[in-house]
Amino acid sequence: MISSPSGSSKEKNTLFPIFLKLAGRRCLIVGAGKAAEEKVPALLASAATVSVVAPAATPKIQGWARDGKLFWSKKRFESQDLDGIFLAVVATSSKAVNRAAFQEAEQRGILCNVVRDRSYCDFYYPAVVRRGPLQIAISTAGHSGALAQRLREELEYQFGPEWEDLLRWLGAVRSSLL
């Protein structure tokens, strides 16, 4: 249903906003092209244990593998690649592989995101503003990544680098009071 800009849509936003602790958790990326490459930095920044499965990879993904930042299996996706995985991101050019990987992840209770296909997503990547411990996430529920990025840029201006120092100071004050 398409609604007017006034917000008369009856569609409910049932997404649950959450920040996950991924440190040490196993995350799998199926595919190693540009779309997959874009998802890697956020997982690495979260201290996740990242594995990539794909027959070929972009030079950047190959570099991360060489540097020991992630594990790259040079092969096609198989269902056993999901063994022990907490979260999966699927970013191949094959709709059949994307669908199969999502369905297998769903059967195993693994959170999964198929890049650029809202119908096969348990979660969406938000646009994020980071200022030290402050993180502001913006989601359009997969409707418009461009709008989310524009809002991120506006918030980055509104919440400049000085917020990092302020928040660290507030954290120190809070700790001294507890």
Model-predicted segments: where are they?
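Hydrophobic, well-ordered beta-alpha structural blocks that scaffold small-molecule cofactor pockets
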Residues: M1-A56, I61-W64
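Residue-level detector of alpha-helix initiation sites
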Residues: G33-A35, K95-A96, G142
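An accessory alpha-helical subdomain
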Residues: G142-L178
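ADP-ribose/adenylate-binding Rossmann-like module
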Residues: L87-S94, N98-Y125
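Hydrophobic beta-strand scaffold residues
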Residues: V50, W72, L111-C112
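Structural motif
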Residues: R26, F86-L87
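Short loop/edge segments at beta-strand edges and connector loops
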Residues: A54, W72-R76, R116
